[in-house]
Amino acid sequence: MALQSPGATGASSSVSRLLSSAKLSSTKTIFSVDFVRSYCISKGTKRRNELSGFRGYSPLLKSSLRSPFSVKAILNSDRAAGDASSSFSDLKPQVAYLEDIISERGACGVGFIANLENKATHKIVNDALIALGCMEHRGGCGSDNTSGDGSGLMTSIPWDLFNEWAEKQGIASFDRTHTGVGMLFLPRDDNIRKEAKKVITSIFEKEGLEVLGWRDVPVEASIVGHNAKQTMPNTEQVFVRIVKDDKVDDVERELYICRKLIERAVASESWASELYFSSLSNQTIVYKGMLRSEVLGLFYPDLQNDLYKSPFAIYHRRFSTNTSPRWHLAQPMRFLGHNGEINTIQGNLNWMTSREASLRSPVWHGRENDIRPISNPKASDSANLDSAAELLIRSGRTPEESLMILVPEAYKNHPTLMIKYPEAVDFYDYYKGQMEPWDGPALVLFSDGKTVGACLDRNGLRPARYWRTSDNVVYVASEVGVLPMDESKVTMKGRLGPGMMISVDLENGQVYENTEVKKRVASYNPYGKWVSENLRNLKPSNYLSSAILETDETLRRQQAFGYSSEDVQMVIESMAAQGKEPTFCMGDDTPVAVLSQKPHMLYDYFKQRFAQVTNPAIDPLREGLVMSLEVNIGKRGNILEVGPQNVSQVVLSGPVLNERELEGLLGDPLLKSQILPTFFDIRRGIEGSLKKGLLKLCEAADEAVRNGSQVLVLSDRSDNPEPTRPAIPMLLAVGAVHQHLIQNGLRMSASIIADTAQCFSTHHFACLIGYGASAICPHLALETCRQWRLSNKTVNMMRNGKMPTVTMEQAQKNYRKAVNTGLLKVLSKMGISLFSSYCGAQIFEIYGLGNEVVEFSFRGSASQIGGLTLDELARETLTFWVRAFSEDTAKRLENFGFIQFRPGGEYHGNNPEMSKLLHKAVREKSETAYAVYQQHLANRPITVFRDLLEFKSDRNPIPVGKVEPASSIVERFCTGGMSLGAISRETHETIAIAMNRLGGKSNSGEGGEDPIRWKPLTDVVDGYSSTLPHLKGLRNGDTATSAIKQVASGRFGVTPTFLVNADQLEIKVAQGAKPGEGGQLPGKKVSAYIARLRNSKPGVPLISPPPHHDIYSIEDLAQLIFDLHQVNPKAKVSVKLVSETGIGTVASGVAKANADIIQISGYDGGTGASPISSIKHAGGPWELGLAETQKTLIGNGLRERVIIRVDGGFKSGVDVLIAAAMGADEYGFGTLAMIATGCIMARICHTNNCPVGVASQREELRARFPGLPGDLVNFFLYIAEEVRGILAQLGYEKLDDIIGRTDLLKARDISLVKTHLDLSYLLSSVGLPKRSSTSIRKQEVHSNGPVLDDTLLQDPEIMDAIENEKTVHKTMSIYNVDRSVCGRIAGVIAKKYGDTGFAGQLNLTFTGSAGQSFACFLTPGMNIRLVGEANDYVGKGMAGGEVVILPVESTGFRPEDATIVGNTCLYGATGGLLFVRGKAGERFAVRNSLAQAVVEGTGDHCCEYMTGGCVVILGKVGRNVAAGMTGGLAYILDEDNTLLPKMNKEIVKIQRVTSPVGQTQLKSLIQAHVEKTGSSKGAMIVEEWDKYLAMFWQLVPPSEEDTPEANSDHILKTTTGDEEQVSSTLAEK
């Protein structure tokens, strides 16, 4: 039976009926429950089979917090409340461990309703329940299909309901001013619950509060899902009277203190996690649980009671990637409802812990210690953000001010911000050095009971729509259409853009939009005065103009600090010459540092983490306006105190300092900088020496800070380096001091600067920053730049024109520029925008360092396999140091061969000998030659973690004849996703033909596929075919189609026909060799053939963004999976991830999002081009990722739901069997498949000069391609036979029988050169799936369940029109739960007629609010009209047809002022027309290829990455217009002359519309827009054409300059006067 997807809904007829009745019937809550149930389960369809469970192997916190407030102490102590305070030293700072943080990730659907008259009604609560139910598809469910990931409501306290209860209990009516209400989850055990309540009562009484009573909250337990019921708490309410405070804020503070004391009192108890305050307040209350949206109101009968009234409600539906039933993580939290993910959370938690010691405020009257700890590393990111906001609000900040501090907008590089509200810029500048942003996708709803509001993250990565009605109600929601609405009463429709906020003042009945909110908050204090008088900017200083060391001394120091000739030549000198990071290819096939037999720098044991699925990466090149490397140096003030003293800091434009700039900081009298040498003494032996040196350094740092130093400069600079005093690895030193200061409450008092010789690559800088350094002076790297510039070789090459001439100053500037650019890329991989959020965030994982090292310097980072001790690390450090001081010191740097293969250098898995042996075996079809190849692999050095494992068996060997045939095994083999463009057509098609012969699967990669490949060959003669004349070795019956067709971020070639001709569809989220990055196919590789497949022009660079712009969260991924299942219900959908710590949690979410296949790629996968630092330092080994994924999925009950595929460096049958034993069902080969078809590992893929035509588009090189399909067939058959042989030795007949059997693996008895590793993580097991691998692989494609398209396709007239190419007209209602509407119809048409062959006309009119992905993947002949509004992703992937969207006629707003469609419209569209009467959200026409559109205003990033088509915008646009736009044209009406500052001018030029052809194109599109939509704005423009034509700008990329529509003679050359005119106009406004 097929499994259903998230949000599977029935036909819309029942919805229509219910919506109609909703407007007329009473508003009793019981109706809303029925409505929602019908909405989501109509026609008896089953609930969707989203699955989840628990992750039971997360380690506990390394140190638990035991407080004097233990339960025993509380119950037996009579001491006064005033004595119940502990000092900061009693509260050991809690470390944020990565394993805890990544165990919970999520996303959601959220919204609020607020009555401006502050009128409490039950209708508000009822409407919130309805809206919540209409976003059920944005939430997740457990493996039992009924346990929701969480839903809840926050409202004001329903005093009428509680007073009725009080009266029945004989309790006097509650004094609303002085009564607090606690909503608690309590232990289920009766005795423990009694004990818990005693503790709570005791603390309340000791604090002077009177407990008025306890109320058992009525619940309907029978409707709770099985999983959730296992941990369902007892839910009670406690009512307390506060007698000593009159002000609301004081009452709330007292309740806050009580709650914190209670939490600390029970923290050390075994049942502590079972006690949780959902809320404890005098103003608000939260009802929530592990429930689906539609049952929240049923579970809590209170919510159905007419006496439950509130003037506002915040509602929240959660989608957690890892849902063991944890009731307290449901939302809303106590203040916030959060949709998104905080990707800086580890750093945020560490910094919050650091600042606890400095927290002081008069409002606490000396009780600050009683509210610590503020954060909880074991809670979710949302819970910790809520705790941070709660601290600020309870300390006197308003909710709006608190959120502006925590989630600031991108106020730098904002063209109009200084004009609109300069005081807000001062506010942000003030707090920039006080609080690191909580960065990541975030729609945050908030309320303290007096105000309710919402704010959006700086990048606008979550949808947020709002509207207001004439009866003074304001609505905000993740989607429009969540409530039945009389459109005639709607007076305003809008959306929150990036960094924007909306706030409703309930007490004064006012709505404040973004600018008003920011101005009001910024006016509280004279921030501008404080900033201007106290914040100092470090002025850039000139670089040194000559070398300061002799050449021999420079060489000696380079040797001492671990430099190799590759590091100097390929990294430092390349950066100095070109000003950018060097690019390489083919992935990393060398051993990781701990397995290497050569010494490595400490940095090499760290891998950068990256964003995938739960939050997006950022494009640092095209969206750099939201990023900044600015850093504040100096003491951070007390965040609870506001005043000028907090900004006595120095601002650096970036973290890389030259020597003179460091001197300037050292000379600043206010900073009181202290230089701390970082050397350790080995004169008494190596044992313990490094640890002693670190302890001495930490003590010196401690003393310096306590003596007032605000800057600690850790320096390994020495005039005379000594052989017996080696330098402590700077990363180790920085981490140790950072951790020491945190543990001692001193971290906020000083910045750390590294003055180091051992830092030259981007990765080194990133590591130092990530573990606490605010700035780095790379003195030896700068000296190396100077020596390079002065060398005779460089001088001669410049003189001879072999390299550009650069000055000494420019060489060093280039180097710093390259580092800064690389750092932005590192930040962006994780989706982090600001340096301040990355600093100290520890966004790395460690491979090969033991617990001693990690706990000393890198506490909280994941190191799953152990590794080097401090003494072993000291020995490795000394390997470099001793060489530098030996008598026979080399006269040149050694080439370790870490990057390029060289004899005698580091071992490379893909070495020339291996390639030759493999070529011989497959070309000669020689078993003997393959045996030699096998022996070569068996004799290689330990290279990857699986090399440390070997097989053991519980059975006797069997004859190989009893083992399943090779033909069955090869069906599990796949090739990697290599794009046609990165590799040649010959290579791509040869691989596909070979895999089809075998019954395996090839992967198209990005870039589409030629339809000629989809049909079997019938014209083969002597191995050649006129259909594919460039190939050889063919047979009749061969097909060159790729069974797996990839959907990557650029969506190149993704058309409806491409999708419907796939057996599987792969969503490529990340790539092993460069996770978190996008790609760019250089124009020189875009031939006419490639351009045709990608719907572009030859020679035009084609950019693939780092993220999918329709995947910013897990529920977005679920939507894309839904889209693909919609258009091709027969294709399994796979999601490609890259191994990293936490992948199990992500994989759990992917399985719940209804994926059929999860692919895990290792770091050692190949690439056509990538920065060296990415190839070497990002991504993890698949062995660890596979182990984590298998355990998590089994633990969560999800394993049977998905196929697990793994790839990365596979070379043999041994690799296949180890992967199988660890849980993989299918196995991918990339690099080896290319080698088998002819690749010689020249490693110049990125140059387009591949000598054998494997990775080149040059015809003369492609002609040299030697590969035959039979070669690859031979390779895979040899692999399969090898698998059979090993299975026979193990005594197993089928591969099925060993999948997941880690008990068949053991650690090899082998000694590593450097240390020993703990492989228990790889070998441990949590059980096996309940079904066999074959059963899982053969299960049906997961289903979307009944959808609106199914109903339409059952209409005889529609089917007749499709079958016989007729014309049909249909009209029907649509609702937000109707998603991807028309996608399935488009798939049916595309399968029958292709992308352009349908001659009929389907004219479908919808009325209402369309769900996500409306009109996706349309084909020509589909004409779709929507009267109403739509959510995100309208026209996604459309190849033709027409979409018209306009609001209903009887509205209370002007359409051109209203947001009518959501974000990311026309993503990847390859044709068709879109007309929108109204405004769109962010990223309109992103990656549009050929569609034409007219819209009346857009948000930020419109026309981003466009490669074709035409877009007309008749209104205002946001920032960053046309970033990455390499093709197509755009026309933008600029009535107020504000466009120029919003333009991204990197590629496009901007001109007035002077070409007659361009004018005709523009006018005809506007006329069509008026005709289709009735647009009054468009009609006015056409009527006064000459007037408005002069206001239009035409955006022209280079590829369009010679087209008739764009006359290059009139390109605007922006002058100073033009810019002044624009600035003047902005100032007037």
Swiss-Prot record:
Q: A single GO BP annotation from the record?
A: L-glutamate biosynthetic process
Give the top-level enzyme category: oxidoreductase
A single Pfam family, by name?
GATase_2
Record keywords, A-Z: 3Fe-4S, Amino-acid biosynthesis, Chloroplast, FAD, Flavoprotein, FMN, Glutamate biosynthesis, Glutamine amidotransferase, Iron, Iron-sulfur, Metal-binding, Oxidoreductase, Plastid, Transit peptide
InterPro entries attached here?
Aldolase_TIM (IPR013785), ET-N_metabolism_enzyme (IPR050711), GATase_2_dom (IPR017932), Glu_synth_asu_C (IPR002489), Glu_synth_asu_C_sf (IPR036485), Glu_synth_centr_N (IPR006982), Glu_synthdom (IPR002932), Ntn_hydrolases_N (IPR029055)
Functional note: May play a role in primary nitrogen assimilation in roots. Could supply a constitutive level of glutamate to maintain a basal level of protein synthesis.
What name goes with this protein? Ferredoxin-dependent glutamate synthase 2, chloroplastic
